[in-house]
Amino acid sequence: MGKKDKRWVLQRKKDPYYNLAKRKNYRSRATYKLFQLNEKFNIIKEKNVVVDLGCAPGGWLQAARDMTGEEGFIVGIDLQQIKPLPYENVIAVKGDMTDEETLKKIQDILPEKPDVIICDASPNISGVWDVDHTRSLELTTMALMTATKMLKKGGNFVVKVFQGDLFYKYVELVSEYFDKAFTTKPRASREESAEVYVIAKHYNGKKFNMKSKSDIVKLLKPQDELKREESALSLRKNISDEDTGMIIKKIKQLRAKKD
């Protein structure tokens, strides 16, 4: 085990939320983030129907089950196969939240439209701030799109976002579809983490507008060249710092070209 790995293991052992989650048989320390968010904003209530986007390893599914009780209903979706939880009213589906067939499958499972959609998913981290922020926004905007397809009117939405230049543009976009939007960082988030949570309440029923002039929506428009540049960046072990800087600059230029 390398020095970095040893340091990480030691830090984790000292982490009160990691130890508490282990004692309580929760699958992730992130479980306590949702507990704290709900304590502050009253997002999930007893008997609610909840959908968890990017639910692996299942910590938020467990938290949502504790909040909704036996009469609630929770469905999680993730690209990974999730080990089933011992509750009849918690179901995990392997699939892509952007895939219409997967969404149809979830809608068929649900007893009614969800009251709440939650998303604690993270993109693949490159270690380059600009790229990670962009990937986070792409992922969270896809989560917002999914929320507008599934949520019942008046429903709530919770999503994790990485801070960066366009963070408040994302909050503005969320505000187009919800009556209220808040930003917060729960106590269980690590101090050094760039993550922030957006809490959106009372969905107004509007469907996602792909023709929006929002800078955030522009990020979703496909551009093969941008993908190729980001793929090159993911292999940057063999790329010099100077070349990495040039790639980031190119990504910004390509992003600026989008209509």
Curated annotation (Swiss-Prot):
Key words of the record? Cytoplasm, Methyltransferase, rRNA processing, S-adenosyl-L-methionine, Transferase
**Which residues are responsible for catalysis?**
K160
* Domain of life the protein comes from: Archaea
- Show the catalytic activity: uridine(2552) in 23S rRNA + S-adenosyl-L-methionine = 2'-O-methyluridine(2552) in 23S rRNA + S-adenosyl-L-homocysteine + H(+)
- Is Methyltransferase set as a keyword in this record? yes
* Keyword Plastid listed: no
| One annotated Gene Ontology cellular component of this protein | cytoplasm
Q: Which InterPro entries match?
A: RNA_methyltr_RlmE (IPR050082), RNA_MeTrfase_FtsJ_dom (IPR002877), rRNA-MeTfrase_E (IPR015507), SAM-dependent_MTases_sf (IPR029063)
Supply the enzyme class, top level. Answer: transferase
* Protein residues bound to S-adenosyl-L-methionine: G58, W60, D78, D96, D120
Summarizing the function annotation, the protein's role is: Specifically methylates the uridine in position 2552 of 23S rRNA at the 2'-O position of the ribose in the fully assembled 50S ribosomal subunit.
Family named by the database record = Belongs to the class I-like SAM-binding methyltransferase superfamily. RNA methyltransferase RlmE family.
Which HAMAP family does the record associate with it? RNA_methyltr_E (MF_01547)
Q: Indicate what this protein is called per its UniProt record.
A: Ribosomal RNA large subunit methyltransferase E
This chain's source organism reads: Methanococcus vannielii (strain ATCC 35089 / DSM 1224 / JCM 13029 / OCM 148 / SB)
